[in-house]
């Protein structure tokens, strides 16, 4: 991902304030609610029968936190996203058979969640920089599919 120095600063500055547990659970939960076909990858998570069940599900929250912790690893290695996400790409491609489009969807949901959490602090330049990052992460995660 090519980010200017200013964009990197905007992304890392905001990311330092993100509550990964809260935002991660919300982002994954929203993905599962808005795109219900993604639930098939989470059969072991128990009750996903309604929006409130999904959003209150402790396994959704825990996995969402894990997802955002990985995102943090990516932000620390913006110049090597493919390397950073190589093992996760392999897992999601070879073992879990996740449609790579889901990575893009989750990235877009994450941008919405961050906008909701940060309000006016999530300025258009911050959003634009985050869109670049989540697109780069989605591409890195889809790398093994090519």
Swiss-Prot record:
List GO BP terms, alphabetically: hydrogen peroxide catabolic process
Q: Where on the chain is Phosphothreonine found, per UniProt?
A: 12
State the GO CC annotations: blood microparticle; haptoglobin-hemoglobin complex; hemoglobin complex
Query: Which InterPro entries did the record assign?
Result: Globin, Globin-like_sf, Globin/Proto, Hemoglobin_b, Hemoglobin_oxygen_transport
Residues recorded with modification N6-acetyllysine: 59, 82, 144
The family database entries (CDD domains) matched by this protein are listed as: Hb-beta-like (cd08925)
| The keyword Acetylation belongs to this UniProt entry's keyword annotation | yes
* Residues that bear Phosphoserine: 44
Q: Which residues make up the binding site for heme b?
A: 63, 92
Locate the N-acetylvaline modifications and list their residues.
1
Q: Which UniProt keywords apply?
A: Acetylation, Heme, Iron, Metal-binding, Oxygen transport, Phosphoprotein, S-nitrosylation, Transport
Q: Name one GO molecular function term.
A: peroxidase activity
Q: What Pfam families does this protein map onto?
A: Globin
Q: In which tissues is it expressed?
A: Red blood cells.
* Record PTM S-nitrosocysteine, positions in chain: 93
Domain Globin intervals:
2-146
Summarizing the function annotation, the protein's role is: Involved in oxygen transport from the lung to the various peripheral tissues.
Q: Partners and quaternary state?
A: Heterotetramer of two alpha chains and two beta chains.
What family is it from?
A: Belongs to the globin family.
Q: What is this protein called?
A: Hemoglobin subunit beta
Q: Which species is listed as the source?
A: Blarina brevicauda (Northern short-tailed shrew)
């Amino acid at each position: 991902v090519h980010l200017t120095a200013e964009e990197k600063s905007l992304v890392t500055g905001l990311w330092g304030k993100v509550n990964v547990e809260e935002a991660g659970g919300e982002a994954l939960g929203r993905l599962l609610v808005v795109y219900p076909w993604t639930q098939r990858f989470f059969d072991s998570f128990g009750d996903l029968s309604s929006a409130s069940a999904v959003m209150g599900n402790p396994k959704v929250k825990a996995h969402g936190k894990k997802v955002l912790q990985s995102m943090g690893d990516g932000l620390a290695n913006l110049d090597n996203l493919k390397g950073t996400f190589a093992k996760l790409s392999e897992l999601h491609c070879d073992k879990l058979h996740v449609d790579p489009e889901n990575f893009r969807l989750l990235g877009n949901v994450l941008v919405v969640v961050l906008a909701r959490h940060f309000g006016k602090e999530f300025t258009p330049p911050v959003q634009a920089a985050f869109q670049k990052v989540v697109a780069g992460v989605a591409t890195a995660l889809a790398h093994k599919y090519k």
